[in-house]
């Protein structure tokens, strides 16, 4: 009612003043919320309407394996697991923004990072066999930027190199799952054909038991929770689950 823009949690900075707006696409039903947040934050909805002073809208998460439904609204998708490439990617964006480089140059530099898909660098066409709109190749801008013809999903090879975060914002209200959570493995040994996560998070990788115990104790100590969930697609299939539980529950 007061036409106040959407602001950040920590600094109360309006969304449209950031260099990058990052969104995590966990489910397709979240797509409308992404557009609502951009609108409330004063960010032009369509990427083609954004100028050099507008933030880069960067999306990641599981549903980025099929990015096209949000392609008109997102400047760049990071397909796969972001831990290894995201810090350098953000530093590159920040440096180029400070130098006053045009938006197209920033996107061109981003397209050289493994796993980054820039929708505006590709063309679409109607597939006569399926009746669906599909990517047909690079656009003229994509060729000029030397964008890859195909973007490959990236993944972290060693989870222990990226400790699970234990310091995170606490909600003002009681959460549905009121406990700490630690990812102990990524990927799944079952390979069920109906399971998207089991396919896109291949190969199976496990954190070492020592790192898991360290993350559990750190999370409980910093967040004040008295219980922790060991998160995995199939926790019982983790190779070290028996000794891990015996260590955590004496």
Each predicted region: which residue ranges?
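Generic detector of short, locally flexible boundary/turn motifs and exposed helical patches
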Residues: 23-25, 42-46, 52, 143-151, ...
């Amino acid at each position: 009612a007061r036409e106040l823009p959407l602001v950040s949690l920590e600094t109360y900075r309006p969304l449209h003043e950031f260099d990058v707006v990052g969104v995590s696409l966990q489910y397709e039903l979240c797509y409308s919320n992404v557009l609502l947040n951009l609108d409330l934050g004063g960010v032009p909805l369509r990427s083609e309407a954004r100028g050099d002073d507008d933030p880069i809208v960067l999306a990641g998460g599981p549903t980025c394996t099929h990015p096209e439904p949000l392609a008109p609204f997102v400047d760049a998708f990071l397909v796969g697991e972001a831990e290894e490439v995201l810090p350098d990617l953000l530093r590159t964006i920040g440096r180029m923004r400070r130098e006053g480089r045009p938006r197209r140059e920033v996107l061109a530099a981003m397209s050289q990072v493994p796993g980054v898909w820039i929708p505006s660098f590709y063309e679409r066409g109607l597939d006569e066999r399926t009746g669906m709109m599909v990517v047909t190749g690079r656009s003229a801008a994509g060729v000029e930027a030397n964008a890859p013809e195909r973007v490959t999903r990236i993944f972290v090879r060693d989870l222990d190199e990226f400790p699970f975060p234990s310091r995170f914002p606490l909600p003002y209200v009681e959460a549905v799952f009121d406990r700490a959570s630690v990812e102990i493995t990524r990927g799944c040994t079952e390979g069920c054909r109906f399971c998207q996560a089991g396919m896109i998070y291949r190969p199976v990788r496990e954190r070492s038991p020592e790192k898991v115990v360290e993350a559990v104790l750190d999370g409980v100590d910093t967040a004040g929770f008295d219980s922790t969930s060991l998160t995995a697609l199939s926790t019982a299939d983790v190779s070290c689950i028996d000794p891990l539980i015996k260590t955590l529950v004496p």
